[in-house]
Amino acid sequence: MGETLGDSLIDPESDSFADTLSASTSQETTMVDTEMPFWPTNFGISSVDLSVMDDHSHSFDIKPFTTVDFSSISTPHYEDIPFSRADPMVADYKYDLKLQEYQSAIKVEPASPPYYSEKTQLYNKPHEEPSNSLMAIECRVCGDKASGFHYGVHACEGCKGFFRRTIRLKLIYDRCDLNCRIHKKSRNKCQYCRFQKCLAVGMSHNAIRFGRMPQAEKEKLLAEISSDIDQLNPESADLRALAKHLYDSYIKSFPLTKAKARAILTGKTTDKSPFVIYDMNSLMMGEDKIKFKHITPLQEQSKEVAIRIFQGCQFRSVEAVQEITEYAKSIPGFVNLDLNDQVTLLKYGVHEIIYTMLASLMNKDGVLISEGQGFMTREFLKSLRKPFGDFMEPKFEFAVKFNALELDDSDLAIFIAVIILSGDRPGLLNVKPIEDIQDNLLQALELQLKLNHPESSQLFAKLLQKMTDLRQIVTEHVQLLQVIKKTETDMSLHPLLQEIYKDLY
């Protein structure tokens, strides 16, 4: 058991999924290139892994599922740290995919261009304060999210502008005695009552301060909000500490965060735009422009492109399994579960997590590849011969809907932990402790979503529904693999993936 996690997957003599889990977290090892994405999108074959894919040494027959001694797994140190961190906010952007024959790029035209800070990994709109997962100040007039301290009160951009226009133009509205309720959706219906509400909450043209909320006041309000939450629910402090711990582990385990990926997709980085691969010619051109980790020159490959892309996905999946396994070990209580149950949870959970995180690399037109250096179009992937052309389309369909939820990395960190700790997986020996851990994670997720997305009251329920969708995607993926097993007799699966797919749905 002294081998490292990386060695257990690269060495052709070590192909057990349990070996992957049993690698000691106390050792400082280099598993994979820390700049690699954590989902299967680097298309190509690694020279080190070619022996594992040898058609004679490994067939498509699935090897028996085995377990090993997990005594080397060390429990990660878990500190109860107050949860305080600025989270990324991702807006909706239009992606204008501009394809050129020899110079391809992704052109983005956001309605309100954000700027990207590599240091803080934040998206910030020019007219908004940086998002904070605990910062949910409401407009005193309509209840919408306040953009700052305007005319003496916390107000949104809409009410600030309404009050300014009314005062500047000296507008007089028709009297209304209905005392209309002013909220986000109705604020434009009765201008008289809206202006009266502005005055009632204290908006004044003579207010000393207006504009963005002062940092000192923001910190004070943040402390008050945290204190109020903790007083209402004493357990919330522990839940926020758990969320902070999971986020930190997430950042360490997965080198390419959603914030970084979306920055690349929206062109808000100092790096050059990713090279667009949309046909065979651009694929060949891409080999000269993109530093692929796994790929060997197309001219030197005897296998067709569809098979090479499929095999490249396999090796990226293997790396993703490594990263997900390390993250799972950081979930409080996971390493204390029955050792066979740890293997079962990962066996069933890894691909659901891979497709969850793959969505961050996707838009409706394509997917980032090779650490964001390239962008392979959806149409090109669909054009591959069957059954290979059918593999990615369900993932794109899921990604478009999943990305509409506008989750950020702090949300995803908890969500993937919930996926791992699913107590209804087949073959579990001791379900109760698994369900106890997941219950705690679900509470942390619900609190996180309420604080981070106060305007989306149904987000928690919608997100749980996505877990069902993910299982269906994995089921369809396994079915396609069975088709390949019958039609592509000269192909083989990576041994680790063979073990994972055995008896999976």
Curated annotation (Swiss-Prot):
It comes from the Eukaryota. Its main location: nucleus. The keyword Zinc-finger applies. Residues 238-503 form the NR LBD domain. Pfam families: Hormone_recep, PPARgamma_N, zf-C4. Residues 17-26 have a biased composition (Polar residues). There is a cross-link at K252 (Glycyl lysine isopeptide (Lys-Gly) (interchain with G-Cter in ubiquitin)). A motif (9aaTAD) lies at residues 495-503. PDPK1 activates its transcriptional activity independently of its kinase activity. The keyword DNA-binding applies. One of its GO terms (molecular function) is E-box binding. Residues 1-26 are annotated as: Disordered. GO terms for cellular component: cytoplasm; nucleus. Phosphorylated at basal conditions and dephosphorylated when treated with the ligand. May be dephosphorylated by PPP5C. The phosphorylated form may be inactive and dephosphorylation induces adipogenic activity. Ubiquitinated by E3 ubiquitin-protein ligase complex containing FBXO9; leading to proteasomal degradation. Ubiquitinated at Lys-252 by TRIM55 leading to proteasomal degradation. Ubiquitinated by E3 ubiquitin-protein ligase STUB1/CHIP; leading to proteasomal degradation. One of its GO terms (biological process) is rhythmic process. Residues 205-280 are annotated as: Interaction with FAM120B. Coiled coil: none annotated. Keywords: Activator, Biological rhythms, Cytoplasm, DNA-binding, Isopeptide bond, Metal-binding, Nucleus, Phosphoprotein, Receptor, Transcription, Transcription regulation, Ubl conjugation, Zinc, Zinc-finger. It is found in: Nucleus; Cytoplasm. The modification Phosphoserine is found at S112. Residues 136-210 bind DNA. Nuclear receptor that binds peroxisome proliferators such as hypolipidemic drugs and fatty acids. Once activated by a ligand, the nuclear receptor binds to DNA specific PPAR response elements (PPRE) and modulates the transcription of its target genes, such as acyl-CoA oxidase. It therefore controls the peroxisomal beta-oxidation pathway of fatty acids. Key regulator of adipocyte differentiation and glucose homeostasis. ARF6 acts as a key regulator of the tissue-specific adipocyte P2 (aP2) enhancer. Belongs to the nuclear hormone receptor family. NR1 subfamily. The 9aaTAD motif is a transactivation domain present in a large number of yeast and animal transcription factors. Interacts with FOXO1 (acetylated form). Heterodimer with other nuclear receptors, such as RXRA. The heterodimer with the retinoic acid receptor RXRA is called adipocyte-specific transcription factor ARF6. Interacts with NCOA6 coactivator, leading to a strong increase in transcription of target genes. Interacts with coactivator PPARBP, leading to a mild increase in transcription of target genes. Interacts with NOCA7 in a ligand-inducible manner. Interacts with NCOA1 and NCOA2 LXXLL motifs. Interacts with ASXL1, ASXL2, DNTTIP2, FAM120B, MAP2K1/MEK1, NR0B2, PDPK1, PRDM16, PRMT2 and TGFB1I1. This is Peroxisome proliferator-activated receptor gamma.
